[in-house]
Each structure stands twice: as structure tokens, then as C-alpha cells.
Regions:
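Active-site-adjacent betaalpha module
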Residues: 1-43, 77, 94, 105-242
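A short alpha/beta connector and helix-capping loop motif
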Residues: 40, 44, 57-93
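Generic enzyme active-site microenvironment
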Residues: 45-46, 50, 89, 195
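Short acidic, Gly/Ser-rich segments with clustered Asp/Glu that frequently serve as metal-coordination loops
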Residues: 49-57
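Short, solvent-exposed loop/turn segments at secondary-structure junctions
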Residues: 51-52, 93-95
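Short coil/turn segments at secondary-structure boundaries
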Residues: 58-65, 103-111
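Metal-dependent catalytic neighborhoods of phosphoester/phosphodiester hydrolases
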Residues: 97-101
């Protein structure tokens, strides 16, 4: 049995994670679209950029809220380059959602917490966004609307999906991996792109979590680990899409 603690055993890997995140390349949105074959072959999926995670409520996080401006800029830039396919996935929970046993009650259906943030809802093309409320971390579980939408995009020629939102290790990870793994299972080529500038996760320090009787959540570590894991599975992870 190795008596060294995890921090010591994994020191080299943690250094690697630091270097990986610090060295993420910047990518050109225009070039991503061109490589896909044009804007008609690109779709953007916006995951949980809603009030209850970005602005107010039991699970709102200031660090998560910081992704709102770059996400709005990305959507505007994609629109200006001709991308018209945008889907919004939103936590919109039943009042007795089983998920509330793991996470404090949040983003209940019909509340302001479950609404898209104003910065995105106020975009000139927001009325064209496909809107998918969800009752679980993964929108691929419990109903077929999102998976049917994604499959429909592929059937219409979409080859590249850009995923942004929160949280890196939860809903964003589930969304990006579902797109990639579904394509793999069908023996199809699909490009999934995640810009670190437009994804984030929350932080709950150990001492605070212990006082609350909750599980701690190291935001910096888990953000880095899940960016790594997305890249490990073939998702293109970049620092930002300029």
C-alpha cells in the first residue's frame, strides 16, 4: 500500500494540469466555422447560463457569473458569422426533484432562477434559440427532446458543436460528452469545441462545506480536471474563441 497522500502521489499530474490550462491555445471562431464547412454546419449549445447559477439563488456563484459576458460575445460573433443554430439548456426543476437530495433546491420550473440571464435573453436573435428545460444534470436523460434536436442537426449537416456554460464538471461535461460519445457510437465524425473562457464551475472550500454539512468542491481543481478529461475524450478545448 502506498502511504503517500494523494497530493504527493499526484504532484506531477497536478503540475501537468496547471501547464495544460495555462497553455490552452486561442482559436479563431471564423476558422472553426470555415473548417466545419460554413456556418450552416455549426451549432452552439448554451448550458445553464441562467439566473440561478449566475446571479441569485442557493447555487448562484460569482465565478460562474463571470462567463456571462464572454458567452454573450460568442453568441453575437457566431450570429455575425452566419451561425443560426443555437440551443439553450436550462435547469427547470420539479418542486420535488430528486436532485435536491444532492444539491440544494434551485432553479425550479417557472421561477426567475430558471430563466436565461438578461444578457443572453436580450440578444437580438434570442427569439430564435431552441429552448430545452431539464430536470437533471444531463439533458440527455429523462426525455428525448435534446438528443432528437442534436440528431436532427447532424442529419441536416451540422458537424461542429460549440458548447459553453456551467458547470464545467457537471452539465457542460455531460453535454459535451453526450455529443462526442453519441457520434462515436454511430461511427460519425463530430467536432465538439469548448472554450475555457465560456465555461466555469463553483467553489466550496472544505471548511465552509464542513460548516454547512455539504460536500466540498474545489472549483479550480475540478475545472482543470474536467477540461483535461474533455480533451482526453477528443473534445477540442481552447482558451477562447476570438
Amino acid at each position: 500500500m502506498n502511504e503517500m497522500g494523494l497530493a504527493r502521489r499526484s504532484a506531477a499530474f497536478l503540475d501537468y494540469l496547471d501547464q495544460l490550462v495555462a497553455g490552452l491555445p486561442e482559436a479563431s471562431l471564423r476558422e472553426v466555422i470555415e473548417r466545419a464547412g460554413g456556418p450552416q454546419r455549426v451549432a452552439v449549445m448554451v448550458v445553464d447560463v441562467i439566473n440561478g447559477f449566475c446571479k441569485f439563488g442557493s447555487l448562484a456563484s460569482e465565478r460562474v457569473g463571470q462567463i456571462v459576458p464572454p458567452t454573450a460575445r460568442l453568441l453575437e460573433a457566431a450570429r455575425d458569422l452566419g451561425v443560426t443554430r443555437v440551443a439553450v439548456l436550462r435547469d427547470s426543476h420539479h418542486p420535488e426533484a430528486p436532485e435536491f437530495e444532492q444539491f440544494a433546491p434551485h432553479c425550479q420550473d417557472g421561477t426567475e432562477e430558471a430563466a436565461l440571464v438578461d444578457e443572453l435573453a436580450g440578444l437580438s436573435h434570442a427569439h430564435t434559440f431552441a429552448d430545452f428545460p431539464k430536470n437533471a444534470i444531463s439533458a440527455w436523460h429523462g426525455h428525448d427532446a435534446v438528443s432528437d434536436w442534436a440528431a436532427g442537426q447532424e442529419e441536416e449537416g451540422v458537424s461542429t458543436f460549440i458548447v459553453c456554460g456551467d458547470c464545467t464538471d457537471l452539465c457542460v461535461y455531460q453535454t459535451a460528452m453526450a455529443l462526442k460519445l453519441t457520434a462515436n457510437a454511430r461511427n460519425r465524425q463530430a467536432t465538439v469545441v469548448v472554450s475555457a473562457e465560456t465555461v466555469e464551475t463553483y467553489d466550496l472550500p472544505v471548511d465552509v462545506a464542513q460548516r454547512l454539512g455539504a460536500m466540498p468542491h474545489d472549483g479550480d481543481l475540478l475545472h482543470a480536471v474536467f477540461l483535461y478529461h474533455l480533451r482526453l475524450n477528443g473534445v477540442q478545448v481552447v482558451r477562447r474563441l476570438a
